[in-house]
Amino acid sequence: MGTARFLRAVLLLSVLLMVTFPALLSAEHHDGRVGICRLPSDSGDCLRFFEMWYFDGTTCTKFVYGGYGGNNNRFPTEKACMKRCAKA
């Protein structure tokens, strides 16, 4: 019974790794920038007004975020955006 439980745990871990490993690989691109930095600006679905920053491929640019939805290429400051997305 201990062997069956061990094999089940190994199988579960293997499936978990097969699902998460490709996502981890695709998160970083060849130049070292994180994948979210390549997403377009997305103001989201709500109508609130927050000045945020997104990386446009070369620099960080200000945009208006509605407060809900959107994507993760959204930073509260230009400094945070540059730290995460700019080439070293």
Curated annotation (Swiss-Prot):
Molecular-function GO terms, alphabetical:
potassium channel regulator activity; serine-type endopeptidase inhibitor activity; toxin activity
Major location (coarse): secreted
Q: Which cysteines are joined by disulfide bonds?
A: 37-85, 60-81
Name its GO BP terms in alphabetical order. Answer: envenomation resulting in negative regulation of voltage-gated potassium channel activity in another organism
Q: In which tissues is it expressed?
A: Expressed by the venom gland.
- Which InterPro entries does the record match to this protein? Kunitz_BPTI (IPR002223), Kunitz_BPTI_sf (IPR036880), TFPI/VKTCI-like (IPR050098)
Q: Name the source's superkingdom.
A: Eukaryota
The positions annotated as site (Reactive bond for chymotrypsin) read: 47-48
Domain BPTI/Kunitz inhibitor per the UniProt entry, residue ranges: 37-85
Q: Does the keyword Repressor apply?
A: no
Offer a single GO CC term for the protein.
extracellular space
Q: Where is this site: May bind Kv1?
A: 39
Q: What SMART domains has UniProt attached to this entry?
A: KU (SM00131)
Q: In UniProt terms, what function does this protein have? A: Serine protease inhibitor that inhibits trypsin at a molar ratio of 1:1.
Question: Member of which family?
Answer: Belongs to the venom Kunitz-type family. 03 (sub-Kunitz) subfamily.
Tell me the protein's name. Kunitz-type U15-theraphotoxin-Hhn1f
- Its source organism is Cyriopagopus hainanus
